[in-house]
Amino acid sequence: MKKEIVLTVFLIAIVASLFAQKSEVFNPSNKAIRGYDPVAYFTEGKAVKGNESLTYHWKDADWYFSSTQNLNSFSKNPDKYVPQYGGYCAYGLSEGHKAPTDPDAWTIVDGKLYLNYSKDIRTKWREGEKERIDKADKIWPGLKDKE
């Protein structure tokens, strides 16, 4: 009887921890970058809303694209275009926590896309961008699968 109780408690703890884990990709309503096209940041230099008929499922999220060309580019090399830290706020990560993002609060640094919570936060992040990237790069591996 005691073994069954211990086993039951153990199984409940495992199931609860699975539900407590957050996706590695920030994807409200299962839309990565809230439905914006990740490739467009690089090719058009601006945030562009994706088309619901042009999607690609990757890392438990649906990625939206504004053109077939962008969809094809992404499908060949997603890592080239995805935002750093799974699309969570770069500033927040540098402070040790996950935070949601605004697709219009973005920056490309050394060929990598970074998103932030808001344009005001992006301004703060840009003031010490290199140091913040170094901090967030160290923190991200421990936070990416956490609540």
Predicted segments with their positions:
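Bacterial Sec-dependent N-terminal signal peptides
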Residues: M1-K22
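Charged, low-complexity intrinsically disordered segments
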Residues: Q21-E147
